[in-house]
């Protein structure tokens, strides 16, 4: 799933993207889908303290554009909100708009506070830091711990980072891989020449151990509902 913005922050936005490629999006929807991430890359943590109405307005705006230029087959409900931080009051409305799983880091910041956790309480954040998933029954939302950020992990550290996760029955059933695609771009100031190789190493490692790719928003965690 590609998590996308509405605007680059200058003079371009999704409303300018043509629908001439819609057939290609639809033809490839079996492996490639688009989902809301945020209105823009900046500012950081845009929804951490923002009113829920702001998050939902941006979500609806981007969802409408995805349906327009890519079609419903290529659309995914939100999977990762930018910086993985929202008010807890947003979990229910996000569920009502189709999200069933939200991914985050669920780890402590340098200041010792649980972070990138959708403002979840400390007890559940700590539990989720050691497990695959946790369901908030009040909202219905399931939270998934991201197991590796590929662009932040050197090539030779990827397998060592994933090996203990795969070996742990509390964490190894679902492997949540995440990267930031700008590291593929030679024009990006922090371009990583080996980014594609890092992705290949991570995906190859987990598929080599029997895992298969799924869309977590489909059915129940990518599998049938019953």
Regions inferred by a protein language model and the residue ranges of each:
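Metal-dependent polysaccharide deacetylase catalytic core of the NodB/CE4 family, i.e.
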Residues: 2-87, 110-111, 181-185
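Active-site-adjacent pocket scaffolds in enzyme catalytic domains
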Residues: 10-16, 20, 73, 80-176
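C-terminal domain-boundary segment and adjacent tail
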Residues: 101-106, 176-226
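Non-membrane alpha-helical structural segments and their capping/turn regions in soluble enzymes
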Residues: 52-60, 155-159, 192-196, 200
């Amino acid at each position: 799933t590609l998590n996308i913005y509405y605007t680059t922050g200058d003079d371009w936005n999704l409303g300018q993207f043509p629908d001439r490629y819609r057939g290609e999006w639809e033809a490839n929807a079996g492996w490639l889908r688009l989902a809301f991430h945020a209105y823009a890359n900046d500012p950081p943590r845009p929804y951490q303290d923002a009113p829920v109405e702001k998050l939902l307005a941006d979500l609806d705006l981007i969802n409408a554009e995805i349906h327009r230029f890519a079609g419903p087959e290529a659309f995914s409900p939100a999977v990762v909100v930018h910086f993985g931080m929202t008010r807890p009051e947003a979990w229910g409305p996000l569920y009502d708009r189709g999200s069933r799983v939200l991914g985050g880091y669920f780890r402590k910041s340098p200041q010792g506070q649980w972070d990138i956790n959708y403002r979840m309480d400390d007890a559940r954040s700590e539990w989720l830091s050691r497990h695959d998933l946790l369901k908030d029954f009040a909202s219905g939302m399931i939270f998934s711990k991201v197991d590796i950020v590929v662009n932040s992990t050197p090539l030779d550290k990827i397998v060592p980072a994933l090996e203990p996760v795969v070996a742990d029955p509390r964490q190894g059933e679902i492997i949540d891989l995440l990267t930031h695609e700008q590291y593929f771009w030679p024009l990006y100031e922090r371009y990583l020449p080996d980014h594609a190789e890092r992705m290949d190493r991570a995906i190859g490692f987990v598929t080599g151990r029997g895992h298969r790719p799924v869309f977590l928003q489909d059915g129940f965690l990518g599998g049938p509902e019953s």
